[in-house]
Design a protein with these regions (language model features):
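Glycine-rich phosphate/diphosphate-binding loop of Rossmann-like nucleotide-binding domains
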Residues: 193-196, 201-308
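Structured beta-strand/loop patches that form or line metal/cofactor-binding pockets in enzymes
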Residues: 41-71
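Phosphate-interaction motifs
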Residues: 59, 64-122, 126, 130
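Glycine/serine-rich phosphate-binding loop and adjoining beta1-alpha1 elements at the start
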Residues: 96, 115-229
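Flexible, glycine/charged-enriched surface loops at secondary-structure junctions
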Residues: 19-22, 38-45, 119, 156-165, ...
Length: 444
């Protein structure tokens, strides 16, 4: 049995009931086998893989708060501080009923490689709670956020751990969290990113992940003598990542014909009218089906199956494991040529393999959606220097980072004889920087 197989079996045995974490570790270790085999004894002697797959610290705490009826509610809060070899922990907070330790470990593990790929000095972490902000009043959300931060503030800081938003944590929640941190600690520091522009936030942060996904796609296409102009897109999801991926794709000449939310999907053969989607999702906080009521010629379909629509480019920007093998087979049969992940691990392992084996150019989320955390790190830099860059400056830096990530993944894949295997390339490139830092810092 190889070293990578031994480590994977150990992960499964020691972390039962955490399938997302197992999946993330397997994908990375499978890619790294060609690297590890070249110098297995050194990696074994320092237990580098065992340390790489084990979080440095997992924090769990209760979050009591009072709802609008005066009833005390109790939720669970978590922070997985996965790896700080190349910088302070950095990664989002997710407020959603599905949140548990296993999902946060998978996200923190992925975040470690993603942050490494940006070239910026940030380690990997992830946190959140099983609290659901949907259907809660502003006062209830504030009460929860203040209680969460009262405990959470003990473990974070501008040079220790700098969280950001994620699913269920937007500008409102970040504001409440930052206010409570400042109140408790008496410090006005860049301890959170995704802040409002009036109190230390960065321009382009909201758009960054979605824009970055399309910048990555553009670079892949250029490498294959192709372009976005005139291509037909499907973009799953209708949150920040999806909306701004659509915006940038349309700016570069793409035609987006379908989007979705957790209830179903819309199809507009004339091209999605993004201003209407923004009004529904960002202003009214409504459901995507309202689009079909407002746009003549558009249709709404309940449930899944958005991949049945023909497209050249498929951008999964909703949630983990949304695209399974059946969907991948349909995409291939319909002539899809590019799949670039906007969400974290939205494609199952067997679907990823099928897409790659059938000539689809596939870029994993740890590379493609790194624009969000990269711009968070740029926000940290602005906070440290007490500066505020223009939107054009931030966007130019974001674009440069995404181009650089593509070339890191592309070069690593070619170096190991796996041209166009961007999954392996991204994993190898991210791994090399982290593991070099771990070696230099000794057994810790």
């Amino acid at each position: 049995m190889s070293y990578t197989e031994e480590v994977y079996e150990r992960v499964v045995a020691q972390n039962p009931g955490e399938p997302e974490f197992h999946q993330a570790v397997k994908e990375v270790l499978d890619s790294l086998k060609v690297v590890i085999d070249k110098n297995e004894e050194e990696y074994r002697s320092m237990s580098l893989l065992e340390r790489l797959v084990e979080p440095e610290r997992i924090i769990s705490f209760r979050v009591p708060w009072v709802d609008d009826k005066g009833v005390v509610q109790v939720n669970k809060g978590y922070r997985v501080q996965f790896n700080s070899a190349i910088g302070p922990y950095k990664g989002g907070l997710r407020f959603h009923p599905s949140v548990n330790q296993g999902i946060l470990k998978f996200l923190g593990f992925e975040q470690t490689f993603k942050n490494s790929l940006t070239g910026l000095p940030i380690g990997g972490g992830k946190g959140g709670s099983n609290f659901d902000p949907k259907g809660k009043s502003d006062r209830e959300v504030m009460a929860f956020c203040q209680s969460f931060m009262t405990e959470f503030s003990k473990y974070i800081g501008a040079d220790t751990d700098v969280p950001a938003g994620d699913i269920g944590v937007g500008g409102r929640e970040i504001g409440y969290l930052f206010g409570q941190y400042k109140r408790i600690r008496g410090l006005y520091e860049g301890v959170l990113t995704g802040k409002g522009l009036t109190y230390g936030g960065s321009l382009i942060r909201t758009q960054a992940t979605g824009y970055g996904v399309v910048y990555m796609l553009d670079e892949i296409m250029k490498a294959h003598n192709d372009s976005i102009d005139g291509k037909t897109f499907i973009v799953t999801g209708s949150g920040n990542v999806a909306i701004y991926a659509v915006e940038k794709a349309q700016q570069l000449g793409g035609k987006v014909v379908a989007m979705c939310d957790s209830n179903g999907y819309i199809y507009d053969p004339e091209g999605i009218k993004l201003d209407i989607v923004k009004d529904i999702k960002e202003v009214k906080r409504g459901r995507i089906k309202e689009y079909a009521d407002r746009v003549e010629g558009a249709s709404y379909t309940e449930g899944t199956g958005i991949w049945n629509i023909k497209c050249d480019v498929y951008l999964p920007c909703a949630t983990q494991n949304e695209l399974a093998l059946d969907g991948a087979k349909t995409l291939v049969a319909n002539g899809c040529k590019y799949v670039v992940e906007g969400a974290n691990m939205p494609t199952t392992l067997d679907a990823t393999t099928y897409l790659q084996e059938n000539g689809v150019l596939f870029m994993p989320g740890k590379a493609a959606n790194a624009g969000g955390v990269a711009t968070s790190a740029l926000e940290m830099s602005q906070n440290s220097m007490r500066l505020s860059w223009t939107a054009e400056e931030v966007d130019a830096k974001l674009h440069g980072i995404m181009v650089d990530i593509f070339h890191k993944a592309d070069d690593a894949a070619k170096r190991y004889g796996m041209k166009d295997n961007y999954v392996a390339g991204a994993n190898i490139a991210g791994f090399e920087k982290v593991v070099d830092a771990m070696k230099a810092q000794g057994i810790c």
